[in-house]
From Swiss-Prot:
GO cellular component: nucleus
Name the record gives this protein: Teashirt homolog 2
Alphabetical list of InterPro entries matching this protein: HD, Teashirt_fam, Znf_C2H2_type
Species: Mus musculus
Bias (Basic and acidic residues) ranges: 103-120, 460-482, 608-623, 633-664
Function: Probable transcriptional regulator involved in developmental processes. May act as a transcriptional repressor (Potential).
Amino acid sequence: MPRRKQQAPKRAAGYAQEEVLKEEEEIKEEEEEEEDSGSVAQHQSSNDTGTDEELETGPEQKGYFSCQNSPGSHLSNQDAENESLLSDASDQVSDVKSVCGRDVSDKKANTHPKLPSEPHNCMDKMTAVYANILSDSYWSGLGLGFKLSNSERRNCDTRNSSGKNDFDWHQDALSKSLQQNLPSRSVSKPSLFSSVQLYRQSSKLCGSVFTGASRFRCRQCSAAYDTLVELTVHMNETGHYQDDNRKKDKLRPTSYSKPRKRAFQDMDKEDAQKVLKCMFCGDSFDSLQDLSVHMIKTKHYQKVPLKEPVPTISSKMVTPAKKRVFDVNRPCSPDSTTGSLADSFSSQKSANLQLPSNSRYGYQNGASYTWQFEACKSQILKCMECGSSHDTLQQLTTHMMVTGHFLKVTSSASKKGKQLVLDPLAVEKMQSLSETPNSESLAPKPSSNSPSECTASTTELKKESKKEKGEGIEDEQGVKSEDYEDSLQKPLDPTIKYQYLREEDLEDGSKGGGDILKSLENTVTTAINKAQNGAPSWSAYPSIHAAYQLSEGTKPPMAMGSQILQIRPNLANKLRPIAPKWKGMPLGPVPTSLALYTQVKKETEDKDEVVKQCGKESPHEEATSFSQPEGESFSKIEPPSESRKAEPCPLKEEEKPQKEKPEPLEPVSSLTNGCAPANHTPALPSINPLSALQSVLNNHLGKATEPLRSPSCSSPNSSTSPVFHKSSLHVVDKPVISPTSTRPAASVARHYLFENTDQPIDLTKSKSKRAESSQAQSCTSPPQKHALCDIADMVKVLPKATTPKPAASSRVPPMKLEIDVRRFEDVSSEVSTLHKRKGRQSNWNPQHLLILQAQFASSLFQTSEGKYLLSDLGPQERMQISKFTGLSMTTISHWLANVKYQLRKTGGTKFLKNMDKGHPIFYCSDCASQFRTPSTYISHLESHLGFQMKDMTRMAADQQSKVEQEISRVSSAQRSPETIAGEEDTDSKFKCKLCRRTFVSKHAVKLHLSKTHSKSPEHHSQFVADVDEE
């Protein structure tokens, strides 16, 4: 608002009447004391009538002054400049007074030009001189009521009103000093209209008005102060700080409110309450301040979800039972992927427990996640596969390891470079779970193959895309049905608590729900095909497809009908999916055969249980019934297939079946699963993806040669297939010694990387190793070790697992695939540093880590104080490491950056501690030795490596050329004329010089070089050639 030009202060007109007032003062002094109390009420009532009525009747009618011309009016005008302006009525009154009193004031001022200069004037004289000022309602609170005649009041009125545009500074200063010096009498409560609100009107009506110096005025008592501090002190002392905005609807005129309103005054209350609502509890508030206080007191701001909030459920409206159901089903975990329980209590119960998916929390912030973890711990500790809840993290870990449900978890962990650490207690618990007491006989298995459950499991498995998912869900249903149907047998049946997929489950599937095994077959086949093509969907560890490449391990065992699985190594010419060798023959239906293959753990049961099982038609009879026509074919095909095993243990397992003649068998018509006998003729070989997967896992983890520590009890099973050997139902097996087994069991045992009791059912291994024990007729043997590796072992042992070096085969295999693979294994130890893709640090080659650690230690420099400081490896050192190890420059740089980050943040890393103190301690990752200086540490690492770091440059060039020559030799030997001819028919344009594989685009070759040969992008052009050039 533009400020008007200030005029020079005029002399107060009151000084001219000093003598007159002295005379009148003595006369009226008595009257003032008598009418003192009455004048206070009169001056207070003047506020009601002196504003609008004076405009019509003039100032003489009632004899009271207008409020607008007193010092209080100046203050109110100043207040109006800050908040609102004067009313029209007050402006017109001041105009009338200023017109009538201008000449009189000039005349009086000229007649008495002398100013009162005596500072010792008494207080009575000053009160008489300025009675006109003090008669206003501004001073009514002080009780200074003076009764003046109408003429004197008119003169005072004209003298005081020097115009709307002038401000009497001197008079204002005197009134201020008078306010400070006058003793305050009893202050009566001001009337309703004594506050400034009476004079406030809209600024649009009267425009801008400047009234003088800045003042701070109390609304209730109209006291003015120079500073805000004084006004604040006054308000605190008198309690005048109550906000009267809440009374505005009742007390204020209905014209307009002040311009600066609160943000929500223009809104309806309903609209404000819709906006001002706590997102957690749903309470509404009238003002933002109330909402803020509520949020701070209740700490609901920590619990507001970032996504759509949960619909508030009143505790009064929801019964405790429904609230418990709501808590059970609410997915509080940020990683929760489903809002329903997958635990199948019963179809009706699970249907009632479902909640709408829109009640999810979504991803939370940290505070919200902490709160929800405490509130819904059992829901956060939930299996992401089957939805089962657990009270502690250890229980969840045990459940996920036993069921194999943690593939998704390990998938995300492997992407972050983390290794799943298994609790030793949980591992022991799993081991104890997998073993059954010798003297304990299994209770009769509850019927879990009801149509409803079979249907449910079938539909569940169709939704799942992974083998382990199907196992876990089938097992969950089996366990739950046992809990509900046979609660009395729960303490008697030790397998109820087991989370493995047991033979009973597969037995039910083979009778009623064959889709289970069909689904397993399809998923395993898909997984192997994807792994062969380098795009695995099964991501339990960073590079699972390396497990399928058969680079250093054994070959897959003979499957049903002597089927050969064409899994080529990674450097092979063309990677082909699994397909039957004889293309003209159709595949036999697999589900039944797979179910028969899994009947393994039955041999761990007592003979009483065996008799019970024999009393009814069971898949054991099915196995024996259809194994007869296959016996001859396998005995013919087996000799060449035996030599395909590079390791001795599988040789023994496969050679035994052909040397033993099966006992008389039941007719084929005893099959109870409805499969035709023709499906099992030797002319129809079938794929067994589970056997292929088993061989792959055994190859990768070294578990294929695990010995059976004790003989199994005589079993009523007999099958002459190469992977399962079972005798007749009613005749005890005879010990059989295989003539081709050239090594004793003791020599086999040293091929084991580890022995674990935590293995589910065996899908491939033979159970006829009774020849290696003297207790062949024992029926109370402990359970056998099964080789379908528990996924927990895979995660735990994979970084340390090294496949045993294969023994030379005694026979020449007929298939070219095995010849190529054996040739490749001859140089696999040297090629391993190049052809294996490097993963995260958990899967690094230990030799590469030693080299990197030694180089990093050599880069540290020592200061004059004896402290060691970080330095950086130069490009030359990094290039030497890259050439020697085959690691890319990017990988080396990332490793160095990670080590530096850990040292700066925590002061230490795995091989280097106390770096922040300047006196590092070096740790050898191989032997855990400690060293104080980099030189001794480097020399120690060189002793592990077998060479000195300074010789690494020379060795790098030699090794590079040697390895590339070997790779080229092996790869060229692997190429057969048919594959080369088939390759030339395609649109391949580029070729890898190292392995002679061809690709459609140059980009594909570069990806191949990076992934297969670990070549950095800087060297890609050296190893790419056009097919047309040759």
